Amino acid sequence: MAPTTGPRNTKNAKPAVQRSKTLKRKRGQEELSSLIQRVEGLDLKESFESFSDLPLSEPTLSGLTSSHFKTLTDIQSRAISHALKGRDVLGAAKTGSGKTLAFLVPVLENLYRRQWAEHDGLGALILSPTRELAIQIFEVLRKIGRYHTFSAGLVIGGKSLREEQERLGRMNILVCTPGRMLQHLDQTALFDTYNLQMLVLDEADRILDLGFQQTVDAIVGHLPKERQTLLFSATQTKKVSDLARLSLRDPEYVAVHETASTATPAKLQQHYVIAPLPQKLDILWSFIRSNLKSKTMVFFSSGKQVRFVYESFRHMQPGIPLMHLHGRQKQGGRLDIMTNFSQAKHCVLFSTDVAARGLDFPAVDWVIQMDCPEDADTYIHRVGRTARYGRDGRAVLFLDPSEEEGMLKRLEQKKVPIEKINIKANKQQSIKDQLQNMCFKDPELKYIGQKAFISYVKSVYIQKDKEIFKLKELKLDEFASSLGLPGAPRIKFIKGDDTKQRKNAPRAAAHLSSDDEAGSDAEEGEPKTKKKEEPQVRTKYDRMFERRNQDVLAEHYSKLINDDGTMVAPPNAGAGADADEDDDFLSVKRRFDVGDETLGMSSDDSDEEDDDDDETSPKKETKVVHIDGKEALVIDSKRREKLLKSKKKLLKFKGKGTKLVYDDEGNAHEVYELEDEDQFKARGDAKEQKAKFLEEEAERTRLADLEDKEIAKQKRREKKEKRKARERELLAEAEDEEETVVQLPPYEGDHDMDGGFSASEEEEEAARPSKKPKVKFAEPDESDKGSEPWYKKSKRTDDKGGSQAPQIQTLEDLESLASGLLG
């Protein structure tokens, strides 16, 4: 038997658990106080080499160790110590130097030392200029903060706003983009930032520029002023206005590479190529074909260019995977592209500046800048996608000859070393003919190419640095031809300067220039006056014939350019031109109303009369049409004038129609004609009229029945006569088809002594064919006279006895039949 156990002492177990919790809480308080003392005694001038040298909490150190972060970079060593002390920091370092950890570690530590919990609200807010960078920051935060008890959230566009609103009030750390954050601050009722401790701006110079200025100012207005602010970027701003907007308090500027000879990583090889605008795509195609075993990023100025180059190169199949990334894509697709490009070994990514800042793509070999960046800072961020964390990298910048001098001057001011290289002409391949062929076959690709051309020209036009971007020196017609387009699309804003000149020009000069442009019309003495065309009334039939495909071949596509370089006129313009041509033949010179006194007048008299009318009556009389059953219809618009041509629409302006019936005398009466009460009473009592009406109706019904019966009887009689006539016709046809029986001529030939046929007759008998002719019918025998016809007898025999009479074909058959009948 198993030993019996006594009752458990529950009274002693509960205090033991309480004592362990108390000891654990006490030990945690001691560690926290020790950590606070270490932070307060931290020497800011001291250099640190590893994370373990810093006064960090155990959960943070465990997360860093699990994520394989051990050694500190220069920016991390200097910025983390200042941030742990609670100071505002402006951090500037080269791309790929580890700025993300430089602000994430202080965020975790400062909240940990304050014993931040879920109910304390939002403690840290991290702003990022792009969604991709926000996602990357959030992933790093999850890795190093896995052992903390904080709740962190990612708030970016492209996701459900309601789901974010439900969870936002429980978050301690938020990584977000400015636009979505401001939306929650304005619309989410339970979201409050009164207890915010830290504000972090990654890529601060981009967030503080004109693109995010109003949004960031609105966000800062919702935040408390007593907070710690951290700003990090590869190209940090020092503007007093920007720093004042964020309410920085004696910020510490940490620029670890300020004294360095270059602003870019040391292992980054930077080159530029003089590539005329029409030859850029040829050079890019040749480069991709020559580097199929590398990982390349290609930057463009606009998303339309990215899409056009991706679609066209994808059809030509260069032999390497192609991807494209721009801001117009859905958030899920952008994440998939980022993941696939990060995992790929050999790939080409066409992108806009959405991927130029902060994104960490591993092992990028080449960074190609097809279009000149807007400034040197953008160039630094673009080339920063390669040569990260001490790796090798190469960057190539394509410059038009008009952009070379100004861009090199800007790069020199930023300490960017760059060398010029030349392209071997024998290795350059032209893809102009292929692009033209694809644009001819695929109208959608042609449309994308036109949009790419327009977006590039706009991006050059809006640039502020006119020393670099000189729009008038670009060969736009040749550039459009290199894209495969039949001509350069017209862009309105290019003529902005000419518009200003025309506006400021004297009116006399403008009048003279307009007279010169009039040409032959002015010489013929016809004054050229411009009148605003009134919009024509378009019916549903006009819309039906003007209907077009609802794809990219819409009206705005056809307006871009014709193949001959002229603008495409709107649909109504063509219709009006055709109408003008048609009016030249049999056009109405003048319309006369009924009773017009000028109908018989000559042209001169009528002209004089018109002049008098114009002087006396300044207003044109309104046409009025009188319609039966309704009030007059006033024709005061073209729509009302077209209304007269539609019978269906005129029905509502007319009275209700009446249907008439005519009696035997030809008098018209309505279908349902009612009589007065006096007329009804004059004909007698109502009961008598009722009885009389029933008698009349009964008599009328009886007569109608007799007539119907006679008609039915006549129809049956006619049907019977037709049937008998048909039988007689069939019998006559049967008699006509009967054939007479063949009778042999009397025998006259010689015969032998035995009474048989001679030898010649036997030979003739043997020579007869074996098949005998058919005889369908035979003549009746003499013995059958007075009896039934033979064909009836045979038919009756067949019906009763089931045996059919033998068919008579020859004389022997007839004799055998006769002998059988005779007995």
Swiss-Prot record:
One of its GO terms (cellular component) is nucleolus. PROSITE patterns: DEAD_ATP_HELICASE (PS00039), HELICASE_ATP_BIND_1 (PS51192), HELICASE_CTER (PS51194), Q_MOTIF (PS51195). SMART domains: DEXDc (SM00487), DUF4217 (SM01178), HELICc (SM00490). Belongs to the DEAD box helicase family. DDX10/DBP4 subfamily. A motif (Q motif) lies at residues 49-77. It catalyses: ATP + H2O = ADP + phosphate + H(+). SUPFAM superfamilies: P-loop containing nucleoside triphosphate hydrolases. Residues 80-254 form the Helicase ATP-binding domain. It is found in: Nucleus, Nucleolus. Its main location: nucleus. Interacts with the U3 and U14 snoRNAs. Associates with pre-ribosomal complexes. One of its GO terms (molecular function) is RNA helicase activity. This is ATP-dependent RNA helicase dbp4. Residues 515-524, 604-615 have a biased composition (Acidic residues). The keyword Nucleus applies. One of its GO terms (biological process) is rRNA processing. It is an enzyme of class 3 (hydrolase). The Q motif is unique to and characteristic of the DEAD box family of RNA helicases and controls ATP binding and hydrolysis.
